[in-house]
Amino acid sequence: MSRSTMLERAGKAASGFESSTTAPVMVRIWNLHKSYGRTEVLKGIDLTVHRGEVVTVIGPSGSGKSTLLSCINFLEPFDSGEITVDGEPVGWVTAAGGRLRMSEQQLNLMRQRIGIVFQQFNLFPHLTVLQNVIEAPIQVKGLAREQAIAIAREQLARVGLRAKENAYPSELSGGQQQRVAIARSLAMDPKVMLLDEITSALDPELVGEVLSAMRALAEAGMTMIIVTHEMAFARDVSDRVVFMDEGSIVEQGAPDVLLTNPTHERTRAFLRRVIERTEIQSETANARE
């Protein structure tokens, strides 16, 4: 059963998807292009995400999903097109009729609005859980230590790890480390969260605890763009699913439409492969028991 959402889902599963929600736009991407050398990896992406919306991006490896997220945070500078987050430009500013790259100070301020979590946890191994979470609020936002600690404890409680604040990353499971990474991002009070395959490096038995934390964020109204291979999660939590292939958005729509009755053959072929792989993994797991 899909989550109850304040956003009204539209049933149109096409690349020209238009949401009927009246919520303000949080992320707007227009005609986004990105190349590595002569290889174009994003080919004119158009995407709008509204405040409080959960958008899941699926597609085969190499389709440009992770690059798209990195461009939204300008970890990967894009070649052309425009991105705005909460009405503010990402990466580039217009000056004297031209386009200039933001200064490092401007980029740091911009990135405070955009949380991003990767499949690698990237925690500082020599710092405790609490120290990992307070580092950016103190060093980047300039918060007082006491204020940063209060925020960190609130976010650790949010992901079910308040009791682990004095532990070191090496003392945590992979799922717990990933939840610390989520709490660390939330401590910066972002406008939008970008989550890039954050369960793919975890053992299967640890995936559920991370998905539960993401579900809680969705229920709390956090705007999220999620790259995932977890189709059940995409169905249950998303307001919209976007299918990408070969650097383009092939189609997008409500999860109960796109995941069960997609319009394009490329989408159908991808979903068939996912189902086949899931069945093989399930049979292998059963054989080991």
Predicted regions and their residues:
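H-loop/switch region of ABC-family ATPase nucleotide-binding domains
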Residues: 228-229
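Short coil-to-helix segment of the ABC ATPase nucleotide-binding domain corresponding to the Q-loop/switch region
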Residues: 127-135
